[in-house]
Structures are given as structure tokens and as C-alpha cells.
Regions:
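A short, N-terminal "cap"/entry segment at the start of jelly-roll beta-barrel domains
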Residues: 1-53, 62, 132-134
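Short hydrophobic/aromatic-rich beta-strand segments that constitute the beta-sheet cores
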Residues: 53, 82-84, 115-117
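Short, conserved beta-strand element in jelly-roll/cupin
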Residues: 55-56, 65-82
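Structural motif
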Residues: 60, 79-81, 88, 104, ...
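A cytosolic small-molecule/anion-sensing beta-strand core signal
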Residues: 76-77, 92-93, 111
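Short acidic-glycine-tyrosine-enriched beta hairpin
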Residues: 86-101
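Ligand-binding loop in jelly-roll beta-barrel domains
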Residues: 101-126
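Short, charged, solvent-exposed linker or helix-capping segments at domain edges/interfaces
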Residues: 127-131
Length: 134
């Protein structure tokens, strides 16, 4: 059958809705303060992944690697650059990056960034998988 034939349906019975989160409200309730270098607001953990919003101040974010997890970032607010494995890329609201484990990366934002991150496997807030390299 073609992709447009509505008589054939995929079985979605195994999918369940766990939670729907208002990201803006979660971030508004957990604002970054001037005393904090950065903040992560965790939105949830699955069996294989974590979702959180990173909030930072304008300026650099040090080069680092994650030894055990891949990282997907979606820019909610902010403009700047991301340096990934030695290559610098401009980033702005709406951009996405995918960074495999053990890939050096860091950034510089011109204004306060908010980035939605998905980490797989889980990024444990109590046992951070981040090694600073500069």
C-alpha cells in the first residue's frame, strides 16, 4: 500500500503518553540567577534518555566532552557559536546540533542562551558526565 492509503494504519497501541511539559513555564519557575554560572532544569528521564533545559549567561562555555552520552541540543533562545571537534559554527534560535560522546565541544553566546538538551543514555544530575578540557 502507498504511504497515502488511509486504510492501512500503523499499530500505535504500544505508545503511551507519559507527560506533556510546558517548557517555558518550567524554565520561568527555575530562573538562572547572577550567582549561578549555569543552570539545568531537568524535565524528565526515560529509561534511555534525559531531557533538560540549559540556561547560561552571555559569554563562553568551556570546552568539554561527555564520555558516556550523546547530546542533542535545540536552541530555544540566544545566538552565538558552537565549536565542535575544532570547527566553529554559528547558532541561533531554532538550530539543532548532534554531538556524539567523546567529541570536544563548547560555545560562546552573545546573549543569555536557553538550550533544550536530550542526552542518551541518561545524563544523571547527581553524577555528571562532563570532563572539562580547557
Amino acid at each position: 500500500m502507498s504511504h497515502h492509503d488511509k486504510s492501512e494504519r500503523r499499530d500505535l497501541s504500544r505508545l503511551t503518553k507519559v507527560d506533556v511539559i510546558d517548557v517555558a513555564a518550567a524554565v520561568d519557575a527555575d530562573k538562572l540567577t547572577d550567582a549561578e554560572v549555569f543552570k539545568r532544569t531537568y524535565l524528565g528521564h526515560g529509561s534511555q534518555s534525559s531531557v533538560f533545559v540549559f540556561q547560561g549567561h552571555s559569554g563562553p562555555f568551556r570546552m568539554h566532552v561527555h564520555e558516556t552520552h550523546d547530546e542533542i541540543g535545540y536552541v530555544l533562545e540566544g545566538t552565538g557559536t558552537m565549536t565542535v571537534d575544532g570547527v566553529t559554527h554559528p547558532v541561533k534560535k531554532g538550530d539543532v546540533w548532534v554531538i556524539p560522546a567523546n567529541t570536544p565541544h563548547g560555545g560562546r553566546f552573545e546573549d543569555a542562551p536557553q538550550v533544550l538538551f536530550i542526552s542518551s543514555p541518561i545524563d544523571d544530575p547527581d553524577d555528571q558526565d562532563r570532563v572539562w578540557i580547557d
